[in-house]
Amino acid sequence: MARSKTSQRWLKEHFDDPYVKMAQRDGYRSRASYKLLEIQEKDRILRPGMTVVDLGAAPGGWSQVTSRVIGDRGRLIASDILEMDSIPDVTFIQGDFTEDAVFARILEAIGEHPVDLVISDMAPNMSGVRAADQPRAMYLCELALDLAGRVLRPGGDFLIKIFQGEGFDQYHKQAREMFDKVQMRKPLSSRDRSREQYLLARGFRGE
C-alpha cells in the first residue's frame, strides 16, 4: 500500500527530528523525555526520594527521566492503556484510565503513601476533528486532576499536558483554586504546530 503524503511527511519529520536522534543517543524511549527534562531544568519539580505518579506513561520516556532523578529511595507508579516495557523499581499498571477499575488499581498501588508529584502526558487518540478531540482530551485532564486531588500531599505538585480550546479556561480556574501557583509551559521540544502545552500547578492546598 502506497504511503499517503501525510504519512510520508510525518516519517520525514520524525527521522529528521533532532530530539528523536537525541533520544536514540541518550537511551530514552521517546522524544517526550526532553519535554520533561526541559521543565525539570527550569522548575526542579523532581527530587531524589520523591513519590511520583506518571499517567499516560507508555512507552516510558517520562518514567525513565523520573526514575533517574528520584533514585532508589523514590517511588514511581506509572500507568497507561498501552503496554510498557518494564523499568527497574517502577510499578506499572496497564489499563484504561477512564475505567473505574483501573483508577482504583492506581489508588491501591499508591496506598497510604502521600504523593509528592503527579505528572501526565496523556492524550486521546486524535481523530483530527477538533470538536471531537478537545472534549476527550479535557476529560482525561479532568480525571488526572481528580486523582491529584485525592493523592497529593499538601504542598505537592501537578504537571499535565493540555490543549488550548474549549474547557481550558475553566480547567485553569479549577487548578488555581486547588494550588498556590499555576503556570503554563511550552517546551522547545514540543513541536511548533502542536497545540499542546503543559500546565504546572505547584503547592497543593489539600482539603
UniProtKB/Swiss-Prot annotation:
Which reaction is catalysed here?
A: uridine(2552) in 23S rRNA + S-adenosyl-L-methionine = 2'-O-methyluridine(2552) in 23S rRNA + S-adenosyl-L-homocysteine + H(+)
Positions the record marks as coiled coil are: none
Question: What InterPro entries does the entry give?
Answer: RNA_methyltr_RlmE, RNA_MeTrfase_FtsJ_dom, rRNA-MeTfrase_E, SAM-dependent_MTases_sf
The active site is formed by 161
Q: Which cysteines are joined by disulfide bonds?
A: none
Q: Mostly located where?
A: cytoplasm
The protein's role, per its UniProt record = Specifically methylates the uridine in position 2552 of 23S rRNA at the 2'-O position of the ribose in the fully assembled 50S ribosomal subunit.
Which family, according to UniProt?
Belongs to the class I-like SAM-binding methyltransferase superfamily. RNA methyltransferase RlmE family.
Q: What is this protein called?
A: Ribosomal RNA large subunit methyltransferase E
Its gene name is: rlmE
